[in-house]
């Protein structure tokens, strides 16, 4: 059995990765996250199970009528209260934090980068374009369409989260990249063969790879939160079931003891054995 010192060393070993993770991920917070409690949340996730085991007292044996009186108290927890209907801002907040929305954003970022890369390949004559340069125009308009979607996303995020939006450096960086990319795309519509602007556009698209990292982090974090919630619910249900079984076992032991006493009184215990 592990001593208290061994448990303390093990716990410190678990806390260290959590601290490193929290220091890294706090720079990737997005709207909807608790900006001030970010580090605390990740430490709590790492050590929650161990803390619950330390705080939870061992079950005391229950005997006789006390067990019968306490058993009815072990009732399933009441169901969650009915949720109020979401307004427009609440629906948008839920959409921005959903896993599917993040997957869509990642796909659009990758597609946008590929479109700009295709434009550069055609503009540098690495692949010979068609006579009227229709392919490059199609790629450019598709890129602008994707950027319009990203601009709408930023506007709706400002509408939903308001000042909270500016507490997250990652969101500000992403918004700056989207706005500058959109302006450069519009400028390139009227000024062709501007290789410097196109190179800057490529650089900005590469910076948007951070958006992919952000999407992956949100996706992993969301799934972890859901799994943690399910495990908590299962833990509560199993704890209630264990307590109920302990009461039942205690009653059975008392009943067996009572029957053995009756057998001894009538001199039948030796014959049964």
UniProtKB/Swiss-Prot annotation:
Processing after translation: Proteolytically cleaved in sperm. The cleaved protomer forms homodimers and heterodimers with the full-length protomer. It confers reduced dependence to intracellular pH changes. Phosphorylated in vitro by PRKCD. Phosphorylation may enhance channel gating.
InterPro entries per record: Hvcn1, Ion_trans_dom, VGPC1_C, Volt_channel_dom_sf
Outcome, altering residue 112 to V: Abolishes channel activity
Impact noted for substituting residue 205 to A: Faster channel activation and deactivation kinetics
Localization per Swiss-Prot or TrEMBL: Cell membrane; Apical cell membrane; Cytoplasmic vesicle, Phagosome membrane; Cell projection, Cilium, Flagellum membrane
Chain segments annotated as coiled-coil in the UniProt record: 223-266
Mutagenesis / variant outcome for changing residue 211 to A: Faster channel deactivation kinetics
A biological process term (GO) from this entry: innate immune response
Acidic residues biased stretches: 47-56
Tissue: Enriched in immune tissues, such as lymph nodes, B-lymphocytes, monocytes and spleen. Expressed in spermatozoa. Expressed in respiratory epithelial cells.
Positions of transmembrane segments: 101-121, 139-161, 170-190, 198-218
Chain residue ranges for the region called Disordered: 46-80
Modified residues (Phosphoserine): 97
GO molecular function: identical protein binding; protein homodimerization activity; voltage-gated monoatomic cation channel activity; voltage-gated proton channel activity
Topological domains annotated Cytoplasmic: 1-100, 162-169, 219-273
Catalytic activity, reaction form: H(+)(in) = H(+)(out)
Keywords (A to Z) from UniProt: Cell membrane, Cell projection, Cilium, Coiled coil, Cytoplasmic vesicle, Fertilization, Flagellum, Hydrogen ion transport, Immunity, Innate immunity, Ion channel, Ion transport, Membrane, Phosphoprotein, Transmembrane, Transmembrane helix, Transport, Voltage-gated channel
Topology of this chain in the membrane: Multi-pass membrane protein
Activity regulation: The channel gating depends on both the membrane potential and the transmembrane pH gradient. The dimers display cooperative channel gating. The channel activity is inhibited by zinc ions and by toxins, and activated by endocannabinoid anandamide and fatty acids.
Main location (coarse class): membrane
Modification Phosphothreonine occurs at: 29
Description of how the protein assembles with itself and partners: Homodimer; each protomer forms its own proton conduction pathway.
Notes on the domains: The voltage sensor domain (VSD, segments S1-S4) conducts both gating and ion permeation. The segment S4 is probably the voltage-sensor and is characterized by a series of positively charged amino acids at every third position. Unlike other voltage-gated ion channels it lacks the pore domain. The C-terminal coiled coil region mediates homodimerization and cooperative channel gating. It is essential for normal subcellular localization.
Function: Voltage-gated proton-selective channel that conducts outward proton currents in response to intracellular acidification. Lacks a canonical ion-channel pore domain and mediates proton permeability via its voltage sensor domain. Appears to play a dominant role in regulation of CO2/HCO3(-)/H(+) equilibrium in sperm flagellum. Prevents the acidification resulting from HCO3(-) synthesis and thus sustains high HCO3(-) levels inside sperm for capacitation.
Protein name: Voltage-gated hydrogen channel 1
